[in-house]
């Protein structure tokens, strides 16, 4: 039995599956990832992307941040790929519990997934930093300059910048689901970003599946490793 057949067997036999995904899940939808050879961290800007995506940079240089945001984070026309669609289908079948994602693109919801835990927020939600008023993402993602609220405060995307903490409620839910999972499928992530990657340490089962095109720090703990494109894998299960 090859690895994809083994994964299919585990999926067919379980109704406590949890999926934990990163940027590689969306690259087949045309959204660049961060750490691959051709990802955002290897492209050249006036500042490194990890600097631009920090809280302190946003506060000091909101104009520069929004140039990057509109140029690189907003990908018009991106559609869910085979991985997003199959995961939504597994949820409808009562097999998949939540999708836990590090992505901010909203493609899991676009595919039909209802139970999505967004560790790093979403570019599809925005709010005023002064009064908290929510704003439609369209105003931020396709506007010009730095968007301001009627109260004068800066409108920011509801994403987690570097130097900021993850949402406690989202993290506690993710920990609960991972602890209770029978099958934990981890896909499209280098597992290099903490604290998100550390969530895998809460898994207590014996069916940890890693789907990634390159090695990860957790390979020695995995029960099944598949080095293929994640969309191609999910098209077969």
Residue ranges and their predicted role:
Residues 1-237:
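Conserved catalytic core of sirtuin-type NAD+-dependent deacylases
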């Amino acid at each position: 039995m090859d690895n994809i057949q083994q994964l299919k067997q585990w999926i067919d036999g379980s109704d406590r599956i949890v999926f934990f995904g990163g940027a590689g899940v969306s690259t087949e939808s045309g959204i660049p990832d961060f750490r691959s050879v051709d990802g955002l961290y290897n492209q050249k800007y006036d500042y490194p992307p990890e600097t631009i995506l920090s809280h302190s940079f946003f506060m000091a240089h909101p104009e520069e941040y929004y140039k990057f945001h509109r140029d690189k984070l907003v990908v018009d026309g991106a559609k869910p790929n085979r991985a997003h669609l199959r995961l939504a289908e597994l949820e409808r079948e009562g097999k998949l519990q939540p999708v836990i994602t590090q992505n901010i693109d909203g493609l899991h919801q676009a595919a039909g997934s209802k139970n999505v835990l967004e560790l790093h927020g979403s570019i599809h939600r925005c709010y005023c930093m002064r009064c908290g008023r929510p704003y439609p993402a369209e105003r931020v993602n396709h506007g010009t300059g730095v968007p301001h609220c009627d109260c004068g405060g800066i409108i920011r995307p509801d994403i987690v910048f570097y130097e900021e903490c993850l949402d406690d409620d989202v993290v506690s839910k993710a920990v609960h689901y991972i602890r209770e999972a029978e099958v934990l499928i981890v896909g499209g992530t280098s597992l290099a970003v903490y604290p998100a990657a550390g969530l895998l340490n809460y898994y207590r089962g014996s069916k940890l599946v890693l789907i990634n095109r390159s090695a990860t720090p957790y390979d020695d703990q995995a029960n099944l490793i598949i080095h293929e494109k994640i969309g191609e894998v999910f098209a077969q299960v």
